[in-house]
C-alpha cells in the first residue's frame, strides 16, 4: 500500500506537530486506512464473519480526539476498484485467502497467538463495514463521502477545491496525486507528522524531489513500483531519481537501460506505465459541490483526439454508469453519465461494487441472519385459490367410537363392579362408629425388651363430654401405674448407672477404707526421718503403692434405688454417694473444729516428681553448722503411678566430701574409708518403682 521507501526519504522535511495546529480546520480522513488499523483489534471476528463493534469504537475514540482539538473530520471511503489496479487487487485477494487458510489451520492446532497474526493479514475491509461507520456519521452530523474509485484521488480533489485543508492518511500515494499537506502517524495523544509539498525544495541533494515536476515524480514512482505498476526490477527510488534527472522522459530512460543491458524491462511495462500516468492525473472523482462525476484534473484535448485515445483514457480513469444502459462502461461524454446513481453511491445508499443492491450495515446484517434462519420457499401458483384452514384444524380432535354392543356390555359390567366396590368402602367406613378401635403398635427397640400395646378408645365410652374424659384420665393417671414404654428414657447426668446390688455393704467398706487411710497418714507423719525415702501424696496423704489400689476401689461409685413419681415398679439404679470422696475424715468425727476435708485430685492435673535435698555443710565452710537447707528441684520424668509423686531426701554430705578428694592423695584415701564406713552403717531399703532420672542417687538410712 503506497510507494515503498518514499516516506523515509522525506524524513528531513517531516515536521512533528500536534492537532492543535489545525484548530478550526477541516481535515480529510482516509476511512479505509483507519478501518485497517482498527481491524487489528477484531481480526478474528472479521475473518470468521462474527459480529463485532470494536472497529466502530476505534472511530468513536478518534472522533472524540479530533473534537477535543476542535478539528472537523471529513471521512472519505474507497469505492469500486479501478481497472488499472485489477492485477494488484487480485494478488492481494489471493494473499488474503492463503493467510486465512494458514490462520484457520493454526487456530485448529491451538497456536492462537500465531494464528492472530495471520488473521490480521487476511482481513478484508468491505463496504458493509464502511456502512457501519456511515450510519454513525449520519447520526452525529459528521461529513463523509464514498469515492467512485480510489479515496486518494477523492481527498486530493477535496483539497484542491479547498473543502479540506489537509489529509490524514498513511498512504504515500497522496503525494503523487498532488497532495499539498499530508498528516501521518497520528497517535492517541493528537501527535502526528506533517509533510508539506512546499518543503520538497528543502530535501538534500541525494533525493532532490523539489527539482522534479509532477509528471517526472509520476515517472519516478512508476519506475520503482507502485499500486498501478510493478516497475522495473532492481530499480529503487534513488536509482529512479537519477534516471529521471538524467534522461527526463520514459522513452530515453528505457533506451538507456536497454543499451546498458544490466536491467531487464518486462514486456508489459510500457502499457502499465501509460495507464498509471493517466490514473494518477485524471482519475474520476465525485464533486460534492456540483454533485456529479468529474476528473481529478482537466483532461487535455490531445488525449481525446482519436477514438483509440479516448478508449484508452476512459478505460484507465474508471468506468461510470451509463444513463440509458444502466451499466458501468466507457462513457465519453458527461451528459451520458447517470450522476443521480453516483450521488447515491457517494452518500452510502448503494453498494459501490453492485449499485443495484442497497448497502447494508454489516452488524445489522449479521444480527438479522443470526435471529432468523428461515428459508422461504416459492409459493405454488398452480392452484388459483389457496385453501384456508380454520383454527380448529390445528388442534387434535377426539374421535367418537362406533356403537358396539359387546364393548358396551363390558363397560357396563365394569362400572357396576366399580360402584359395588365404592359402596362397600363407604359402608365399612361409616358403620360401627362407636366400636372400640384397638391398634397394636409394637414399640420394641434396642432400649426396651417388652413390646407394649396402646389402646385407642372412643371418647363417648368414657364420658358424655370432653370434660368428663379429662377428669377420668387425670384420676387414672394417679392410680394406675405408668407403662414401661411411657417412662422417660433420659437419666440425669448426676446419676451413674451401675449394676451393683449391695449398696449398704459397699458404703460401709468405703468408710472403713477411708478411715484406714487417715490412720496411715497420721502414723507416717509421726515417723518422719530426715535422711529416709518415703512416698507421699501431693496433698499430704501418706499412703503407699499398695494403698493406692484400695483408694482406687474406694472411688467406685455406689448405687441406690430411686423412684420417679407415677412409677410403681420402675426403679432406676444410681449412685447416691457420688460426693462420698468429699466426706470428712472419720478420725476427726468427734471434733468439729479440727475436721479437715479430703480434697480429691483433679482429673486433668498431673503432678511432677519433686526432689528435696538435705545438704549438711562442713564446719570449715559455713558458720551455720548442722542446719538443714532444703532445696526443691523438679524431676525430669513423671512417675508411673498416675497422679502420685515421690519425695526424696538425700544426704549431700558424702557428695561434698567427694568433690574435694582431688586436692591430695591423703584426703582421697580418707574419703574412701569414710565412704566404706557409711555404706556399712547404712541399711539398704528397696526404693519405690520410679522411672525418674534421680533414682541413681544412693539412699541412706538413719
Swiss-Prot record:
Regulation (activators, inhibitors): Inactivated by calcium and zinc ions.
Detail which positions bind Mg(2+) 1: 30, 78, 150, 152
GO MF term (any one): 5'-3' exonuclease activity
In this chain, composition skew of type Acidic residues spans 500-518, 535-550
| Enzyme Commission no | 3.1.-.-
Q: Which cofactor does it need?
A: Mg(2+)
- Ranges of biased composition (kind: Basic and acidic residues): 667-678
Q: Does the keyword Phosphoprotein apply?
A: yes
What subcellular compartments does it reside in?
Answer: Nucleus
Note on file?
Answer: Present with 672 molecules/cell in log phase SD medium.
Q: What does this protein do?
A: 5'->3' double-stranded DNA exonuclease involved in mismatch repair and eventually also in mitotic recombination between direct repeats. Also has a minor role in the correction of large DNA mismatches that occur in the heteroduplex DNA during meiotic recombination at the HIS4 locus.
Say which family it is in: Belongs to the XPG/RAD2 endonuclease family. EXO1 subfamily.
User: What is the name of the protein in this document?
Assistant: Exodeoxyribonuclease 1
Organism in which the protein naturally occurs: Saccharomyces cerevisiae (strain ATCC 204508 / S288c) (Baker's yeast)
Amino acid at each position: 500500500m503506497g510507494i515503498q521507501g518514499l516516506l523515509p526519504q522525506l524524513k528531513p522535511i517531516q515536521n512533528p506537530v500536534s492537532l492543535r495546529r489545525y484548530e478550526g480546520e477541516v481535515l480529510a480522513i482516509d476511512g479505509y486506512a483507519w478501518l485497517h488499523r482498527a481491524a487489528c483489534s477484531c481480526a478474528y471476528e472479521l475473518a470468521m464473519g462474527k459480529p463485532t463493534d470494536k472497529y466502530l469504537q476505534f472511530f468513536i475514540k478518534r472522533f472524540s480526539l479530533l473534537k477535543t482539538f476542535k478539528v472537523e473530520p471529513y471521512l472519505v471511503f474507497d469505492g469500486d476498484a479501478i481497472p488499472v489496479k485489477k492485477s494488484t487487487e487480485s494478488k492481494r485477494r489471493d494473499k488474503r485467502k492463503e493467510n486465512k487458510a494458514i490462520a484457520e489451520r493454526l487456530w485448529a492446532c491451538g497456536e492462537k497467538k500465531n494464528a492472530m497474526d495471520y488473521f490480521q493479514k487476511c482481513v478484508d475491509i468491505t463496504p458493509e463495514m464502511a456502512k457501519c461507520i456511515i450510519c454513525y456519521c449520519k447520526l452525529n452530523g459528521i461529513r463523509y463521502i464514498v469515492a467512485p474509485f480510489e479515496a486518494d484521488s477523492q481527498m486530493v480533489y477535496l483539497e484542491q477545491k479547498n473543502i479540506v485543508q489537509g489529509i490524514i492518511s498513511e498512504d504515500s500515494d497522496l503525494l503523487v496525486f498532488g497532495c499539498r499537506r499530508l498528516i501521518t502517524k497520528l497517535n492517541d495523544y493528537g501527535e502526528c507528522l506533517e509533510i508539506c509539498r512546499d518543503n520538497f525544495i528543502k530535501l538534500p541533494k541525494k533525493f532532490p524531489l523539489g527539482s522534479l515536476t509532477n509528471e517526472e515524480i509520476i515517472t519516478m514512482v512508476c519506475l520503482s513500483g507502485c499500486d498501478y505498476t510493478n516497475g522495473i526490477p532492481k530499480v529503487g527510488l534513488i536509482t529512479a531519481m537519477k534516471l529521471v534527472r538524467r534522461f527526463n522522459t520514459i522513452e530515453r530512460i528505457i533506451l538507456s537501460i536497454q543499451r546498458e543491458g544490466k536491467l531487464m524491462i518486462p514486456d508489459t511495462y510500457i502499457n502499465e506505465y501509460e495507464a498509471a500516468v493517466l490514473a494518477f492525473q485524471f482519475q474520476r472523482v465525485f464533486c460534492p459541490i456540483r454533485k456529479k462525476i468529474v476528473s481529478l484534473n482537466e483532461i487535455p484535448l490531445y488525449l481525446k483526439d482519436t477514438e483509440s485515445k479516448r478508449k484508452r483514457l476512459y478505460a484507465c480513469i474508471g468506468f461510470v454508469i451509463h444513463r440509458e444502459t444502466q451499466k458501468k462502461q466507457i462513457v465519453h461524454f458527461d451528459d451520458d453519465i447517470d450522476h443521480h446513481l453516483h450521488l447515491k453511491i457517494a452518500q452510502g445508499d448503494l453498494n459501490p461494487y453492485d449499485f443495484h443492491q442497497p448497502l447494508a450495515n454489516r452488524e445489522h446484517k449479521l444480527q438479522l441472519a443470526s435471529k432468523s434462519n428461515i428459508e422461504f420457499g416459492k409459493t405454488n401458483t398452480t392452484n388459483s385459490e389457496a385453501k384456508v384452514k380454520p383454527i380448529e384444524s390445528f388442534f387434535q380432535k377426539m374421535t367418537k367410537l362406533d356403537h358396539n354392543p359387546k364393548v358396551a356390555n363390558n363397560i357396563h359390567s365394569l362400572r357396576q363392579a366399580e360402584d359395588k366396590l365404592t359402596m362397600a368402602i363407604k359402608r365399612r367406613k361409616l358403620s360401627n362408629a362407636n366400636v372400640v378401635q384397638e391398634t397394636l403398635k409394637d414399640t420394641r427397640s434396642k432400649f426396651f425388651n417388652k413390646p407394649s400395646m396402646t389402646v385407642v378408645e372412643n371418647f363417648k365410652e368414657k364420658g358424655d363430654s370432653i370434660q368428663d374424659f379429662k377428669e377420668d384420665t387425670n384420676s387414672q393417671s394417679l392410680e394406675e401405674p405408668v407403662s414401661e414404654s411411657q417412662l422417660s428414657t433420659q437419666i440425669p447426668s448426676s446419676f451413674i448407672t451401675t449394676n451393683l446390688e449391695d449398696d449398704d455393704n459397699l458404703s460401709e467398706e468405703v468408710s472403713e477404707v477411708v478411715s484406714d487411710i487417715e490412720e496411715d497418714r497420721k502414723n507416717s507423719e509421726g515417723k518422719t526421718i530426715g535422711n529416709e525415702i518415703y512416698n507421699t501424696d501431693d496433698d499430704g496423704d501418706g499412703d503407699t503403692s499398695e494403698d493406692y489400689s484400695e483408694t482406687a476401689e474406694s472411688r467406685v461409685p455406689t448405687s441406690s434405688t430411686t423412684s420417679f413419681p407415677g412409677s410403681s415398679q420402675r426403679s432406676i439404679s444410681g449412685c447416691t454417694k457420688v460426693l462420698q470422696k468429699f466426706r470428712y475424715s472419720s478420725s476427726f468425727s468427734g471434733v468439729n473444729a479440727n475436721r479437715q476435708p479430703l480434697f480429691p485430685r483433679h482429673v486433668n492435673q498431673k503432678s511432677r516428681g519433686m526432689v528435696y535435698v538435705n545438704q549438711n555443710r562442713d564446719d570449715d565452710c559455713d558458720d551455720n553448722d548442722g542446719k538443714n537447707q532444703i532445696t526443691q528441684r523438679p524431676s525430669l520424668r513423671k512417675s508411673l503411678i498416675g497422679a502420685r509423686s515421690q519425695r526424696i531426701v538425700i544426704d549431700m554430705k558424702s557428695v561434698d566430701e567427694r568433690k574435694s578428694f582431688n586436692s591430695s592423695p591423703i584426703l582421697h584415701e580418707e574419703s574412701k574409708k569414710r565412704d566404706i564406713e557409711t555404706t556399712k552403717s547404712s541399711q539398704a531399703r528397696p526404693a519405690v518403682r520410679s522411672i525418674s532420672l534421680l533414682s541413681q542417687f544412693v539412699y541412706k538410712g538413719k
